[in-house]
Design a protein with these regions (language model features):
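Active-site-adjacent loops and short helices of periplasmic peptidoglycan-processing enzymes
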Residues: 1-138, 142-151
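Domain-terminus/edge residues, biased toward the C-terminal soluble/receptor-binding domains
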Residues: 117-118, 132-134, 138-315
Length: 315
């Protein structure tokens, strides 16, 4: 999707309901950031991991090894949740923001409706599988677009590494972003670094497959790409190709090589001459655009043909 205009460049099954895995955390962080902006909570608040923060975890679920009773700042819990994809951190954040996980999940669903989502229902703040926890690519775009409009959200999801100071129960730890597009040392997804990429979030469960929301910008063209249900395919060298990343890179490289900013009309273009009756200084006025109007469009043909048709309406 072209982030400058909201124009869909390519889509496939964008309204199919699927499990989002940890892409859920985009909504979780959005609600946390909005709570900070309202002044309901503060980044430097001291927050304690409550007794049941690990209660709904499953074996192998991503975590930041947060211990019950451990205290750190609210900001550090946000970094744990987003760049380390720590599920227990999401529970702590939800409890702190809304008083209970159930109240937070209710707020997630309300916010999704406010953003125009029609195929989404959340059942938890982290994305571990539940039958009634689903979304669509279109809805994830709506949620992510709103989230990226908040500076704090954009900063956190684009952070490659973050250091959490020593706590009452743990030594200092360095969190490493799971997104291999922006972190060449990603704990899971190496070999996909892309210089034009920025956050947003990785996700994986057996039910959801490999999922990725990301953005990239080149020559003023800003794109958002969402891949859901990617496969993990063994390579001959013993490594794994993760479809969420390889498909994303294929999409970015294709769009950036075939699309670009094109001037629809230029401020110097003469649109027409409009007759003026009884004019003091002439019998017509020249109509030109107040400014150049551009859009992201397919590149011109080799002969320079514009590949689009201009239609100008005078009011």
């Amino acid at each position: 999707i072209d982030l400058n205009t909201g124009r869909v460049v390519y889509e496939q099954d964008a309204d199919e309901r699927v499990y989002p895995a940890s892409l859920t955390k985009v909504m979780t962080l959005l609600l946390a950031v909005e709570a900070v902006e309202r002044g309901d909570v503060h980044l430097d608040d001291t927050v304690t991991a409550y007794a049941d923060c690990n209660a709904d975890m499953v074996e192998g679920a991503s975590n930041a090894d947060i211990k019950v009773g451990e205290t750190m700042t609210f900001e550090d819990f946000l970094y744990c949740a987003m760049i380390s994809s720590a599920n227990e951190a999401c529970n702590v954040v939800a409890e702190y923001v809304c008083g209970s996980i159930s109240a937070f999940v209710e707020r997630m669903n309300t916010r999704a409706q406010e953003l125009g989502c029609t195929g989404t229902h959340f059942a938890n703040p982290h994305g571990l599988p539940k039958d009634d926890h689903y979304t669509t690519a279109h809805d994830l775009y709506r949620i992510t677009k709103e989230a990226l409009s908040h500076e704090l959200f954009a900063t956190i999801c684009n952070t490659v590494k973050h250091t959490v100071p020593a706590t009452n129960l743990s030594e200092e730890r360095t969190l490493s972003n799971t997104n291999g597009l922006i972190n060449p040392d990603s704990p899971m997804y190496r070999g996909y670094y892309y210089e034009y990429a920025k956050g947003v979030k990785t996700g994986h469960t057996d039910a959801a497959g490999y999922c990725l929301i990301s953005t990239a910008e080149k020559d003023g063209v800003r794109l958002l790409c969402i891949v859901l249900g990617g496969k993990g395919t063994a390579r001959a060298n013993g490594t794994t190709d993760f479809g969420s990343f390889s498909d994303t890179l294929t999409a970015y490289r294709w769009v950036f090589s075939h699309y670009g900013w094109r001037a629809i009309v230029s401020a110097s273009d003469l649109i027409c001459e409009v007759p003026v009756r009884y004019g003091r200084d002439g019998d017509s006025v020249t109509v030109r655009p107040a400014q150049t109007v551009s859009a992201v469009l397919p590149a011109a043909d080799s002969d320079g043909a514009p590949q689009f048709e201009q239609q100008v309406t005078l009011y």
